[in-house]
Amino acid sequence: SLHDALPILGGYIVLEPRSATHYLLSDQKTRLVDEKRRAARHAAGLLEAHQMAFFDCGTTTPWIIDAIDNELPFTGVCYSLNTFLALQEKPLCRAILCGGEFHASNAIFLPLSLQDTLSHLSPDIAYYSAAGIDCEQGATCYNLEELPVKHWAMNNARYHVLVVDHSKFGKVRPARMGELSRFDVIASDVRPDDDLLALAKEKQISLLY
């Protein structure tokens, strides 16, 4: 319907394409909310006062921000509209939104050049979302346009936290972020399967669940 095709993001109406294999933020935001919140709470506890944190796009990320103590001062770096709106709610957060071309399906701003704002930043910690995690294929997502900023964070942040609910286990999506060994922590809502437990032990990845 026309109503479904015109979601409201941050007070603005945007037209978005729809296909069975394409990630749409508006479709995902009501799925597995309790599970996402549980994983997010584990991850939020890793942030320390006065740190700079990178926050990925996706529907789990705002729950990480929601779980951060309102008394904690920090700097939040983001490139998606829904993440920026969540950061605005934290009274002691200095929010940095990286601008660029807007993509409505996942509400991200893709920088026209990574040499703009991002080249001046070196986050203490980075929080990532993914649509799939697999022991062989690593962390993957739906949209190729997310990869430049995700890869920037993976190369420039000092500590890396992958935050996923259990529905992402064993899934492989088209856009590859990287090996699971690139992450220091994987936070989820339930205990991962034995294969992932074994990989985490081998690669010294901390698991939070």
Question: What are the roles of these predicted feature ranges?
Answer:
Residues 1-54, 66-71, 88-92:
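HTH-adjacent hinge/linker in prokaryotic transcriptional regulators
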Residues 56-57, 165:
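Short His-Asn-centered micro-motif
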Residues 59-62:
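Gly/Ser/Thr-rich loops at beta-strand to alpha-helix junctions
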Residues 69-74, 144:
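A glycine- and small-aliphatic-rich helix-loop capping segment at beta-alpha/alpha-beta transitions
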Residues 82-209:
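Conserved phosphate- and dinucleotide-binding cores of soluble alpha/beta proteins
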